[in-house]
């Protein structure tokens, strides 16, 4: 399983792209098999322009980098309260583009005035991907003490010390020149007097490492060389007219000089990397710059303001200087207006500046903690947690691969029809709708649903008679006759069950209008239990915000014996494994360990012993109270030696009353989604729906059924 590292910026202008590139290079140096994932595009120019980091990675490496979701699409989903849909799209995009990677580097959103939702969305994405969080921040005007306070404040907004996925922090632009607002202000221009020069607050990286509340995984000092931009980038920013191209694509601008004085007072600024800004009616400055160029000084560029046409005689005089590669370009604005435009120049790395990108990567990588990078590919002891969007995505993918047929006896029920259409569209399963074709098509049309490929409609009136003989044969020991069989086959659940029994379909889903008893009774009579199973039980998949839990049994067995409870535990653990959840089974009771007595506790204790004996490969412990099973701090005091306490993923309730009450209380109080009940122990998969099931509930139950069918047939 890939390690997922998410870089989350704490503010604007922290240099997120530079840090991402540096971490990528640090991983490349260690031979890490890496993939880069930007969930949501955030182009600086706004709109749906290409994302900066993703474009740079694609243009400058062979690393796989997924196409991010467009910001306009994300904003549309958020404005229509569809954050769950957004998270599912992100997890789908993640899985589609990060296969075979040892480490996936995820880049979060930068919080801006326009995107004030960035941090809350970053937190949701981190939870969805179960990512290890690394904050990226710049020093700004902070002293070491203030910086540590800001680190602690940032951690608290992401769950604080309880969030064990917070791995550390990377401090960028350490000891950079900043203004009073903490914005980086490199002194490119000589136009300002000393009173406006930026300040530098010195911090020792070694001392910062010692005092930081989080591990400092990188402390990157400010480097002026990294912002040296190409002359062509300046020309593009100003929308300038190029007079002489020269080396405009490779010359670097390291300072800006406004030539308002006489030549003798400006000669010291005629140096390599200078952008000389002068009015186009100052031929003396132009000629002086040309002389410097002919003497080997690689001036960054010459910028002419005012829009004056260059005298042809001057151009002729400067030909040899132009031939040295001196870039010259012109704007129509005056010098003052031009200076204002230059101050708004974006110092970010352009996507096509390969040389600068390489320099940034090498420089930043030198300051990323090498031990941390090495640890990313070491054997991880982090237990796997499956987030709800990841779980739902996994259901869809596994069902697609299974390619199964699922019969829906309530074929003309509106929610069922809609769910069948969704399953067909997503390729989850081929749904067989039982019902009158005209009525089913009418229901579909009334909902704007198109029933195309991937959906079959079977008219019970046409096929019912063909199943009479088989039903009589299966139930002849119970006195079944043909007239009674015909009467029972009027029930579409019975008809669908016989289709399943004869392998015409792979699974059955019902319950949107039928009771649980009506759904389960025919399969129990005709399909019966799987080999090795003495009972049928059920589980609910509880989709908590950060993790998926398995609850059993909350729907079938009123008061199981110790032996039955042990079997339910084993069935539930196997179901967890089948759906990608690492099973740590808590046998629940009202007391923990040996602290309680009584028949109820003894039943759970005996069930735990039996389950452990039957399946020593599974992690099973009990009796445990619910809080001891889920809360690490409670587990330390109540069950310090338990391998399950504080980290359980599968919860086995002692009876139906406790299980059903707890399931509904957790579901309602936490306002979370649950999927189920999924029946366990059947020879072939049959699943029951709640009569209040939503369309999505039906879709995921169909997916569960298809996956069960695939696993049972292996």
Swiss-Prot record:
Q: What is this protein called?
A: Phosphate acetyltransferase
What this chain does, per the entry, is described as: Involved in acetate metabolism. Catalyzes the reversible interconversion of acetyl-CoA and acetyl phosphate. The direction of the overall reaction changes depending on growth conditions. Required for acetate recapture but not for acetate excretion when this organism is grown on ethanolamine (EA); is unable to complement an eutD deletion during growth on EA. Works with proprionate kinase PduW to capture exogenous propionate and regenerate propionyl-CoA during degradation of propionate and 1,2-propanediol (1,2-PD).
Gene Ontology BP terms: acetyl-CoA biosynthetic process
Q: Where is this region: Phosphate acetyltransferase?
A: 390-714
Name of the gene this protein is made from: pta
Pfam families assigned to the protein according to its UniProt record, in alphabetical order:
AAA_26, DRTGG, PTA_PTB
What is the organism field in this record?
A: Salmonella typhimurium (strain LT2 / SGSC1412 / ATCC 700720)
Subcellular location per the Swiss-Prot or TrEMBL entry = Cytoplasm
Listed result of changing residue 273 to D:
Increases speed of forward and back reactions by 2-3 fold
- How is this protein activated or inhibited? Allosterically inhibited by NADH.
What does the record give as EC number? Answer: 2.3.1.222, 2.3.1.8
């Amino acid at each position: 399983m890939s390690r997922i590292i998410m870089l989350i910026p704490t503010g604007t202008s922290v240099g997120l792209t530079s840090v991402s590139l540096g971490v990528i290079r640090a991983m490349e140096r260690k031979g890490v098999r890496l993939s880069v994932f930007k969930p949501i595009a955030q182009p600086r120019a706004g709109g749906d322009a290409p994302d900066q980091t993703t474009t740079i990675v694609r243009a400058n490496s062979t690393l796989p980098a997924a196409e991010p979701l467009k910001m306009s699409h994300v904003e549309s989903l958020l404005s229509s309260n569809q954050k769950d849909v957004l998270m599912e799209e992100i997890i789908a995009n993640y899985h589609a583009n990060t296969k075979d990677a040892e480490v996936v580097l995820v880049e979060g959103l930068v919080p801006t005035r326009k995107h004030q939702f960035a941090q809350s969305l970053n937190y949701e994405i981190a939870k969805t991907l179960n990512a290890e969080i690394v904050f990226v921040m710049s020093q700004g005007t902070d002293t070491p003490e203030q910086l540590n306070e800001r680190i602690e404040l940032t951690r608290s907004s992401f769950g604080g010390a309880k969030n064990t996925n917070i791995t550390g922090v990377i401090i960028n632009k350490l000891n950079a020149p900043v203004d009073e607002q903490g914005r980086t202000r490199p002194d490119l221009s000589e136009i300002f007097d000393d009173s406006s020069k930026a300040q530098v607050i010195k911090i020792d990286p070694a001392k910062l490492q010692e005092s930081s509340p989080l591990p400092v995984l990188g402390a990157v000092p400010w480097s002026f060389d990294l912002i040296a931009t190409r002359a062509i980038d300046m020309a593009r920013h100003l929308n300038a007219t190029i007079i002489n191209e020269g080396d405009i694509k490779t010359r670097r601008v390291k300072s800006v000089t406004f030539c308002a004085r006489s030549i003798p007072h400006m000669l010291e600024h005629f140096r390599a990397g200078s952008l000389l800004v002068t009015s186009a009616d100052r031929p003396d400055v132009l000629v002086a710059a040309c002389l410097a160029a002919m003497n080997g000084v690689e001036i960054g560029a010459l910028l002419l303001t005012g829009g004056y046409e260059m005298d042809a005689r001057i151009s002729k005089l400067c030909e040899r200087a132009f031939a040295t590669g001196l870039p010259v370009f012109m704007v129509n604005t005056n010098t003052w207006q031009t200076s204002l435009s230059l101050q708004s120049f974006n110092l970010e790395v352009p996507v096509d500046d390969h040389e600068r990108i390489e320099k940034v990567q090498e420089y930043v990588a030198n300051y990323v903690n090498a031990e941390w990078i090495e640890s990313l590919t070491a054997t991880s002891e982090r237990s796997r947690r499956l987030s709800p969007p990841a779980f739902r995505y996994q259901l869809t993918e596994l069902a697609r691969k299974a390619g199964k047929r699922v019969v829906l006896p309530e074929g003309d029920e509106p929610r069922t029809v809609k769910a069948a259409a969704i399953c067909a569209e997503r390729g989850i399963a081929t749904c067989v709708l039982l019902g009158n074709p005209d009525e089913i098509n009418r229901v579909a049309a009334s909902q704007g649903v198109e029933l195309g490929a991937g959906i079959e409609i079977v008219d019970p009136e046409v096929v019912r008679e063909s199943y009479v003989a088989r039903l009589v044969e299966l139930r002849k020991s119970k006195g079944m006759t043909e007239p009674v069989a015909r009467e029972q086959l009027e029930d579409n659940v019975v008809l669908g069950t016989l289709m399943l029994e004869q392998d015409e379909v792979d699974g059955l889903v019902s319950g949107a209008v039928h009771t649980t008893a009506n759904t389960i009774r025919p399969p129990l009579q005709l399909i019966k239990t799987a080999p090795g199973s003495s009972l049928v039980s059920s589980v609910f998949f509880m989709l908590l915000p950060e993790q998926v839990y398995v609850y059993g049994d909350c729907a079938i067995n009123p008061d199981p014996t110790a032996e039955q409870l042990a079997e339910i535990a084993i069935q539930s653990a196997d179901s967890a494994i089948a759906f990608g959840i690492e099973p740590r089974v808590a046998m629940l009771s009202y007391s923990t360990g040996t602290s309680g007595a009584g028949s109820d506790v003894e039943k759970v204790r005996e069930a735990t012993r039996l389950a452990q004996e039957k399946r020593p490969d599974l992690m099973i412990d009990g009796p445990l109270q619910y809080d001891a099973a889920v809360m690490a701090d409670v587990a330390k005091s109540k069950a310090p030696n338990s391998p399950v306490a504080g980290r359980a993923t599968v919860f086995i309730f002692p009876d139906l009353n406790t299980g059903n009450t707890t399931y509904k209380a957790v579901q309602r109080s936490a306002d979370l989604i649950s999927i189920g009940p999924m029946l366990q122990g059947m020879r072939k998969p049959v699943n029951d729906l709640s009569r209040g099931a939503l369309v999505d509930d039906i879709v995921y139950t169909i997916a569960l059924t298809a996956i069960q069918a695939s696993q049972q047939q292996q």
